[in-house]
């Protein structure tokens, strides 16, 4: 028996033809799911197969062609819904926040240098529509508009660039700034790194965000292969190194055991003189450096050759092995300063520095 129009119109759960139709099938034996011109579309779950019936205003079944038309429309709606669901992306950022996009990001503002380098390494440079003021690598990125970053982040500048996503560091922006961005429809994704494993996590996160999972995995594999090769070559090399992140004039800062710099030292067969300190980054004194007497000094201060000259001439440092033997290295291209895919290059530079001078071995690359 065909359900009458009057019987179905009294139902409260009237829903449009589309995704909700499937849900309705599971809840009702028969239901009203839409009003095509001149008739009503019903389904009847009590039949052996789901049976669609269109009844016109006089209560008579309408043509099979019209039924076929509505079936086709239903299939289109269902396929569209499935495609939208398949293209949606959900990531959990490195601050534990779940972020969902309807599709991979195509317009992104990146606030910190390391994340920009990750984006470029996985082939997403064209998606960058804005950059923080310290984002300067690769050189081709310098044509991208700059926005204020850190405590002075200008939300209006960012919104004017119409990004889908802002990628930032957990220490860089305030909760209020994040709230403003999200209230204006911009997704905020937080990336924060201190050791090599967290760099891998950031690469994976950003790769998923951009729909570039395979490219992200390839970057990680390349880094791991380089690290493994250098570590194998460095077996038995037992020297110590001091990483200077902030120069004496601003207060000495160095790297502890939970930092990627400590891991770079280990990869190259060296001991970080502050490996007994758990913090990734820590304030240190001249007395501590002198007492621990490093064989090598690596500067990540951004002061160039002037920084090397200043360290070599420091009063009271003359008995340090690295000073006596003039084994002070400056990170000219900042690859050691940034937890990005270029840590691979940092490991190569460090290996080449200590081995070309110390052991005369062939460079790593």
Regions found by a protein language model. Name each.
Residues 155-163, 284-293:
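Short helices/loops that flank or line small-molecule/ion binding pockets
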Residues 174-176, 191-205, 238-260:
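Extracytoplasmic ligand-binding site segments that recognize negatively charged/polar headgroups
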Residues 106-161, 165-171, 270-273:
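A short, structured surface patch at a secondary-structure boundary
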Residues 1-85:
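Gram-positive cell-envelope targeting signals
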């Amino acid at each position: 028996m065909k359900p009458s129009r009057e019987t179905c119109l009294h139902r409260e759960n009237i829903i449009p033809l589309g995704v909700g139709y499937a849900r309705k099938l599971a809840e009702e034996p028969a239901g009203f799911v839409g009003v095509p011109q001149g008739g009503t579309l019903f389904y009847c779950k009590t039949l052996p197969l789901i049976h669609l019936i269109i009844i016109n205003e006089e209560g008579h079944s309408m043509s099979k062609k019209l039924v076929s038309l509505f079936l086709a429309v239903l299939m289109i709606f269902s396929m569209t819904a499935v495609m939208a669901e398949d293209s949606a992306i959900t990531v959990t950022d490195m601050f534990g926040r779940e972020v969902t996009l309807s599709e991979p990001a195509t317009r992104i503002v990146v606030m910190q240098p390391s994340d920009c380098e990750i984006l470029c390494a996985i082939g997403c440079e064209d998606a960058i529509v804005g950059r923080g003021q310290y984002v300067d690598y690769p050189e081709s990125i310098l044509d991208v508009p700059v926005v204020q970053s850190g405590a002075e982040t200008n939300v209006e500048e960012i919104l004017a660039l119409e990004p889908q996503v802002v990628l930032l560091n957990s220490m860089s922006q305030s909760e209020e700034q994040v709230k403003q961005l999200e209230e204006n429809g911009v997704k905020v994704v937080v990336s924060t790194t201190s050791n090599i494993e967290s760099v891998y996590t950031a690469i994976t996160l950003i790769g998923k965000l951009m729909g570039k999972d395979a490219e992200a995995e390839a970057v990680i594999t390349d880094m791991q292969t380089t690290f493994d090769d250098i570590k194998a070559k460095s077996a038995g090399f037992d020297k110590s190194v001091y990483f200077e992140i902030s120069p004496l004039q601003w207060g000495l800062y160095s790297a502890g055991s939970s930092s990627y710099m400590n891991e770079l030292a280990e990869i190259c067969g060296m001991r970080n003189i502050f490996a007994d300190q758990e913090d990734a980054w820590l304030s240190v004194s001249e007395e501590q450096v002198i007492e621990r007497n490093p064989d090598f000094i690596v500067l990540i201060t951004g002061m160039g050759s002037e920084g090397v000259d200043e360290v070599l001439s420091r009063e009271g440092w003359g008995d340090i092995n690295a000073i006596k033997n003039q084994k002070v290295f400056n990170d000219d291209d900042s690859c050691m300063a940034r937890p990005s895919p270029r840590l691979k290059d940092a490991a190569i530079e460090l290996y080449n520095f200590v081995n070309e001078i110390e052991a005369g071995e062939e460079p790593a690359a």
